[in-house]
From Swiss-Prot:
Free-text cofactor note: Binds 1 Fe(2+) ion per subunit.
Assigned GO CC terms: cytosol; nucleus
Residues where Fe cation binds: H183, D185, H377
General function of this protein: Alpha-ketoglutarate-dependent xanthine dioxygenase is a non-heme mononuclear Fe(2+) enzyme that decarboxylates alpha-ketoglutarate to succinate and CO(2) while hydroxylating xanthine to generate uric acid. Allows xanthine utilization as a nitrogen source.
Domain of life: Eukaryota
Protein name: Alpha-ketoglutarate-dependent xanthine dioxygenase xan1
C-alpha cells in the first residue's frame, strides 16, 4: 500500500456547551410493570436523544412478556441500563443476550480473537470457561473468578493505538484522557455484527477525568472514570444533508479480511474515530488464511427492526472499500484507502460532538444492553496499577446481516 502522510478531514466547528435539553421521552410503566425512564444526563448533553433506565424486573426470572417489553424499549432507546444487578451470573447474561437472536450461539468474534496474537483485540479479552460466550474484561489482577484461577487484565489505553498520545504528565497530573477507538462490536470477517452487546459492571472504580478530542475542534468534556461512550447512528444519519442521505442509502462498506490484524501496526486519529493512512496496514499476504467468500460487506445505513429508522453504522478504522450502487445500475468502487477513511470520518464526526455523546457512569451492578446496530461506542479512561475493574461482556455473532434501506426508503428520499 502506498504511504500517505495523513487523512484529510473536515474539521468540525467549535461548539459552545449549554444546559441540558428536556429528556427525550417521558418515563412510563409497561404492561408488565417495568419502569422505563430517561438516563440522567450532564449539562453538556444537549442533543442526546437516547438511553433509558429499566427497573422493577427480575432478570434471573424473566418472562417472555417482560422480555418483549425490554426488547421494544431497547430498539426505541438504544442503550438500556438495569441498576443493582449484583447477582446476575454469566449464564443469565448469556441467556438474555441470546434471546435477542435465538439462532445465534457463537461469541461475536468467534472465540478466536485470543488466538491471534497480532490482533489489536488480543490483550483485552478472556473467555469465562463455563460460559465461553461471555468475556472477562477490565483492569488489574482478578483471582478465582468463575473458573479463572488468576488473570491480569489491562484496560485498553489510547497510547497503544493513537499515533500522537497525550503525555504521561498531562494524563497523571491533569487527569486528561481520550476516546480510545470508536467502533461497533463486530468481527467484520466471516461473522455478522451482533444485534446487541451486554455489559455487567462487577467492579467499577469511581472518579472523573477530562476527555479531550485533540482534533482542532477545541472539544473536551468531563467523563466518569472508565466510562463507555455511546453515539447514535440515527443522529449521525439525521445530520447528513439531503444529498448525502441519498448517496448513503445506496452505499455499502467492504471491510478488510481479519481487519483487527490488518490495522495492528497502523495508528488512530486523536479522537479515536478513524485512522492515519501511512501505509502501515498489513498486506493481505501477511494475514492469517482468509477466503474472499468470507469477506464482509454491509450497508452504510442499518434499519431498526421496530421503529424503521435508519442508522449510519460503520467501523471506519476497519473499512477497506466503499461501493456506491448508482441509479443507472452501475457501481462506483472507491478503493483509495485515504479517501475511504475521509468519507466515513466526515459522515460520522458531527455525531460525536460532546453534546451528542452519552458517557455511561458505571456503578457496581449496572447491567447495560446496547443496540449494536444502532449506536457506535468507545472505551475511555486510564486506570492506575492499584485499581481493579471487572466487567462481563457478551455479544453473539448474528444469525443474519443488518438490513439496509428498502426500495421504498430510497424512493422517499
Amino acid at each position: 500500500m502506498s504511504a500517505t502522510a495523513t487523512t484529510t478531514v473536515v474539521e468540525p466547528p467549535t461548539t459552545t456547551l449549554t444546559g441540558a435539553t428536556e429528556p427525550p421521552f417521558t418515563a412510563y410503566t409497561t404492561s408488565q410493570g417495568l419502569r422505563v425512564s430517561p438516563v440522567p444526563l450532564p449539562e453538556h448533553n444537549t442533543d442526546v436523544g437516547f438511553g433509558a433506565l429499566i427497573e422493577n424486573v427480575d432478570l434471573n426470572n424473566l418472562s417472555d412478556e417482560q422480555f418483549e417489553d425490554i426488547r421494544k424499549a431497547l430498539f426505541e432507546h438504544q442503550v438500556v441500563c438495569f441498576p443493582n444487578q449484583h447477582n446476575l451470573p454469566p449464564e443469565t447474561q448469556y441467556a438474555i443476550t441470546h434471546r435477542f437472536d435465538p439462532e445465534s450461539s457463537t461469541y461475536g468474534h468467534g472465540n478466536r480473537t485470543n488466538q491471534q496474537n497480532n490482533s489489536i483485540l488480543h490483550p483485552d479479552l478472556h473467555t469465562l470457561p463455563g460460559v465461553p460466550q461471555v468475556q472477562l474484561i477490565g483492569h488489574g489482577v482478578v483471582k478465582d473468578h468463575y473458573g479463572l484461577e488468576e488473570v491480569r487484565l489491562k484496560h485498553p489505553h489510547h497510547r497503544t493505538f493513537h499515533r500522537d498520545p497525550i503525555s504521561e504528565e498531562e494524563e497523571k497530573e491533569k487527569q486528561v484522557t481520550r476516546f480510545y477507538r470508536w467502533h461497533i462490536d463486530a468481527a467484520l470477517y466471516d461473522y455478522n455484527p451482533p444485534v446487541v452487546t451486554t455489559l455487567l459492571a462487577v467492579n467499577a472504580p469511581q472518579g472523573t477525568q477530562t476527555l479531550r478530542y485533540d482534533d482542532k475542534s477545541g472539544h473536551e468534556m468531563p467523563v466518569p472514570l472508565g466510562s463507555t461512550a455511546f453515539a447514535s447512528g440515527y443522529r449521525m444519519y439525521e445530520l447528513l444533508t439531503d444529498e448525502e442521505k441519498k448517496v448513503a442509502a445506496r452505499t455499502r462498506v467492504q471491510y478488510f479480511p481479519h481487519a483487527y490484524v490488518t490495522i495492528n501496526k497502523a495508528r488512530a486519529l486523536p479522537n479515536g474515530l478513524g485512522m492515519y493512512s501511512e501505509g502501515l496496514e498489513l498486506d493481505k499476504s501477511e494475514l492469517p488464511p482468509w477466503e474472499e467468500s468470507r469477506v464482509k460487506t454491509f450497508p452504510l445505513l442499518w434499519k431498526n427492526p421496530v421503529t424503521g429508522k435508519l442508522a449510519l453504522q460503520t467501523h471506519g478504522c476497519c473499512a477497506e472499500k466503499i461501493l456506491i450502487d448508482n441509479e443507472d445500475g452501475t457501481t462506483t468502487v472507491i478503493d483509495d484507502l485515504p479517501k475511504v477513511r475521509e468519507i466515513l470520518y466526515n459522515y460520522q464526526r458531527p455525531g460525536i460532538n460532546p453534546e451528542r455523546v452519552y458517557c455511561h457512569d458505571w456503578k457496581n451492578g449496572d447491567f447495560v444492553i446496547f443496540h449494536n446496530r444502532g449506536v457506535t461506542h468507545c472505551i475511555t479512561g486510564a486506570y492506575r496499577d492499584d485499581q481493579t475493574r471487572i466487567f462481563h461482556q457478551c455479544n453473539l455473532a448474528a444469525s443474519h446481516p443488518p438490513a439496509g434501506p428498502s426500495e421504498e426508503d430510497i424512493a422517499a428520499m
